[in-house]
Amino acid sequence: MLEVRAAVKAPFKLAAAGRGFMNMRMASSKSFQKITVKNPVVEMDGDEMTRVIWKIIREKLVLPYMDIKLDYYDLGIEARDKTNDQITVDAAKAILKNDVGIKCATITPDEARVKEYNLKKMWKSPNGTIRNILNGTVFREPILIKNIPKYIPGWTNPICIGRHAFGDQYKSTDLVASGPGKLELSFTPKGNPSAKETYNVYEFNGSGVAMSMYNTDDSIRGFAHSSFQMALQKKMPLYLSTKNTILKKYDGRFKDTFQEVYESDYKQKFEELGLWYQHRLIDDMVAQAIKSNGGFVWACKNYDGDVMSDVVAQAYGSLGLMTSVLIHPNGRTFESEAAHGTVQRHYMQYLKGKKTSTNSIASIFAWTRGLAHRGRLDGNERLVKFANALEHACVRCVEKGIMTKDLYLLSKSPNGYVDTFEFLDAVKSELDSELVNIA
């Protein structure tokens, strides 16, 4: 038991040296010529421990280096409750107007949260609200760090996985058949009820279950455009996975739509960059992905994406090292956030004045991905370089052995781990070193 206590206590010894080093480097951020950002970025604040971290990132790692207008929206649970969630709608509309949004992790309340925060009602997921208004596709991509082991060692390049988060099982109607009877599916064209189509689905001899689901051509087409846009942005090939051999009309619609969009709008651009697009059956795609070294964008239907995004995240090592971005079909409108939650357990410790070792990397990357997109849209090369430098600073810290507890437990670093704020100090120090190369 004594050995365990010593092991838990020792890791924080690295912190004092890390903080002192940061103070010696602070002058370089003051001498850095600030980047002028021409157009606004929508900033959406969040909840709990990620909200605490979010403010530090903004004040320590972003604002000292640039003149930027942040169109701020507080999406913390209390603000959403106070405005009857109108603040979330307003934030989404602001993203549509300004093209770039950067979001902190937020609480999606369940019954316990409604009671904890004395909420008026169980508000919907702000991510879902924003996604529906923006009509975009969410893509998750791992942050690769050499000394963080992967469960699939062969994945030396990132897999960027897109989930078509509309329709299918998640908007289905299901039922329990209480006994023998006929199950039918019907469609009545609007304005022409006499053209009603009815299909016999199954003749039940006893009790059972049934489900009906749908998707729309507009949503599938938007999903296709978002996927091709992401592949072009990442300069990676794109794969779509379905089961069209079984669902010939349903999944066949996805396959045909993607092929049409590719041929009409993206084939030439892909070929110029040496990229390709392929459709694969979902089972074959999973097998090929496992054998591959990564390095592609994977467009998944709703259920497949729900499952495979978590599989991919875990296989790369940690959900705390996953980025999440939402891309509109136009390729311009963009929202980024961390792929994880609000880290409630650490927040409870923080409120009690206890030290926490919370991983801030995904939250930092939410800022960098949004700033880089703003830079690309505005033709602001210095902003893009700054975003890349901040990402490199995070990675270099971990590769030097400066990391939070979650990554320490994965890497077994001999240096131990630092606390939440010491890691952010170390990132700033590393960033100042990186910025020497930015004119």
Swiss-Prot record:
User: Needs which cofactor?
Assistant: Mg(2+); Mn(2+)
State the free-text cofactor note: Binds 1 Mg(2+) or Mn(2+) ion per subunit.
UniProt-annotated binding residues for Mn(2+): 283, 306
Transit peptide positions? 1-26
- Give the matching SMART domains: Iso_dh (SM01329)
Q: Which GO terms describe its biological process?
A: isocitrate metabolic process; NADP metabolic process; tricarboxylic acid cycle
According to UniProt, residues marked as the site described as Critical for catalysis are 170, 243
Reactions that this protein is recorded to catalyse: D-threo-isocitrate + NADP(+) = 2-oxoglutarate + CO2 + NADPH
Where is substrate bound in this sequence?
Answer: 108, 125-131, 140, 163
Provide the GO MF annotations for this entry. Answer: isocitrate dehydrogenase (NADP+) activity; magnesium ion binding; NAD binding
Query: Which family does the record claim for this protein?
Result: Belongs to the isocitrate and isopropylmalate dehydrogenases family.
Please state what the protein is called: Probable isocitrate dehydrogenase [NADP], mitochondrial
Q: What's the source species for this entry?
A: Schizosaccharomyces pombe (strain 972 / ATCC 24843) (Fission yeast)
